[in-house]
């Protein structure tokens, strides 16, 4: 298709090509329109679905067992954009492969998306029989992993494994054709995970591998989901972690730890940074501020042009929620984050220093006025989406907003000690931004420590570098 990049193909269960997905790479909708085409009997193709960024979308996932219906995720929306059934969070639908008629809404969760609306085809975690055809069930991410079963036998196996590993998440990864052997993983907030083989014929579960067996030697903290309300009335979600030795009624130091992205979200599970902080006596708050994925279309749209503003307030409102529960020593609160989380930490340092005792900004973004907003990660194709969400620096009003919410230009406001960290080989944000931020802190004689690793990029990967990173955290705190 001229001007469009093919991003996926769809076959029926007999291997016959049905259609394909494209992403617009030229024209007025460049970078913001996804389209699905169906092959026609005369060897051509016709447009049957079209989706603009942040609009109501529907994405095919698979043919159903009858090889006539298509299972898909999203909103019930026609090719012209008309919404038949507004569900906000995306739902699992069955549609007629010939007419495109929406036949049934199979499952919907009013609080959580079944898959990220940004990821298109094949984004759901669905369990099919070994030859395809039959859908046993699927999982999606709520406060913890949620599972929906359509096959009683598959459900009984999964629930039996869950009973063996209480307080863990069990994920079946693969299985034999006769459904007698299952490869699965087990993990939790205190366990990074292990792989097992379940042989039903022998009634035996055998460990295959383990991520970090030494973790069991340490007392780690429980990570608990919570919900809170933003100051403008939006229901938001997060996770709170209290130290393993926490005593009820005690007010303790806290670290606010926003995730990166911002088009991402936190999940229940093992988080090395969170456990590091908690085992040093800090409470930790992770929050899915507006703009986080997985909570519906409306919440995503509410984040447009709100970097450093309402998105930032959502982080502080999570802190206030924890304070209302009686957990927080408000005189000893720090904020720590990486990538967009590093931006949020530095924004806090320049706009609301009175709330915090210290700042940890790791591989962060500090200048929103740059034409590419994000540096080397995004090609020209990715910019239109960024401009919708954050603003276009070429637009005078947008530029003003981006400038006013760029920490780089407000270093003189900093009052808290800052640990600022970067990798020289970062390909997702500009290394020069960190250099510029450090120069501004130096110009205003601020209290900061600057760490740069020449062989690391957007997040440290080598074991020695990560060990040194945590040592730097501990020394700084």
Task: Identify the meaning behind each predicted range.
Residues 79-82, 216, 253, 385-390, ...:
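Polar/charged alpha-helical tracts
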Residues 214-331, 338-339, 366, 371-377:
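Cap/lid segment of the alpha/beta-hydrolase catalytic domain
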Residues 19, 136, 226, 256, ...:
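Hydrophobic/aromatic beta-strand patches that form the interior of the parallel beta-sheet core
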Residues 287-477:
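Active-site-proximal cap/loop segments of hydrolase catalytic domains
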Residues 5, 122, 148, 182, ...:
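A general structural-boundary detector
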Residues 1-237, 242-250, 263-280, 321-324:
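Peripheral, non-catalytic segments that deliver or gate enzyme domains
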Residues 140, 187, 257-261, 339-342, ...:
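Glycine-rich His-Gly loop
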């Amino acid at each position: 298709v001229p001007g469009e990049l093919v991003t996926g193909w769809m076959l029926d269960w007999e291997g016959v090509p049905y259609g394909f997905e494209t992403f617009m790479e030229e024209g007025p909708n460049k970078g913001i329109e996804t389209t699905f085409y169906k092959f026609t009997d005369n060897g051509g193709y016709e447009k049957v679905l079209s989706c603009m960024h942040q609009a109501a979308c529907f994405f095919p996932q698979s043919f159903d067992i009858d090889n006539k219906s298509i299972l898909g995720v999203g909103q019930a929306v026609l090719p012209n954009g008309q919404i038949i059934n507004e569900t906000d969070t995306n739902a699992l639908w069955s549609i007629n492969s010939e007419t495109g008629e929406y036949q049934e809404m199979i499952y919907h969760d009013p609080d959580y998306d079944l898959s990220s609306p940004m990821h298109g085809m094949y984004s759901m975690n669905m369990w099919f029989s070994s030859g395809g055809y039959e859908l046993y069930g699927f999982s999606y991410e709520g406060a913890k992993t949620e599972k929906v079963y359509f096959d009683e036998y598959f459900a009984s196996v999964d629930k039996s494994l869950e009973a063996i590993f209480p307080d863990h998440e069990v994920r079946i990864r693969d299985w034999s054709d006769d459904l007698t052997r299952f490869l699965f993983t087990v993990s939790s907030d205190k366990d990074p995970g292990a792989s097992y083989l379940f042989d039903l014929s022998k009634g035996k579960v055998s460990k295959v591998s383990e991520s970090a067996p030494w973790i069991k030697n340490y007392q780690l903290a429980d990570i608990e989901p919570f919900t809170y309300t933003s100051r403008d009335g939006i229901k938001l979600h997060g996770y709170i972690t209290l130290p393993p030795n926490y005593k009820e009624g005690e007010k303790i130091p806290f670290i606010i730890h926003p995730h990166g992205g911002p088009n991402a979200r936190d999940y229940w599970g093992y988080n090395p940074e969170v456990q590091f902080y908690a085992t040093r006596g800090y409470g930790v708050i992770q929050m899915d501020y507006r703009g986080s994925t997985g909570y519906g279309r409306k919440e995503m749209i509410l984040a447009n042009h709100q970097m450093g503003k309402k998105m930032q307030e959502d982080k502080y409102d999570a802190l206030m929620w924890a304070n209302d529960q009686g957990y927080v020593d408000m005189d000893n609160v720090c904020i720590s984050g990486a990538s967009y989380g590093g931006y949020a930490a530095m924004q806090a340092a320049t706009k609301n220093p009175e709330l915090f005792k210290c700042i940890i900004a790791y591989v962060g973004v500090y200048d929103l006025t740059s034409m590419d907003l994000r540096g080397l990660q995004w090609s020209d194709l990715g910019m239109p989406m960024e401009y919708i969400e954050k603003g276009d620096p070429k637009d005078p009003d947008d530029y003003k907003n981006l400038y006013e919410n760029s920490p780089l230009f407000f270093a003189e406001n900093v009052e808290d000690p800052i640990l600022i960290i970067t990798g020289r080989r970062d390909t997702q944000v500009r290394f020069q931004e960190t250099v510029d931020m450090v120069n501004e802190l130096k110009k205003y004689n601020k209290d900061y420590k600057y760490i740069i690793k020449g062989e690391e990029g957007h997040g440290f990967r080598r074991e020695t570098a990560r060990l040194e990173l945590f040592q730097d955290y501990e020394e700084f705190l």
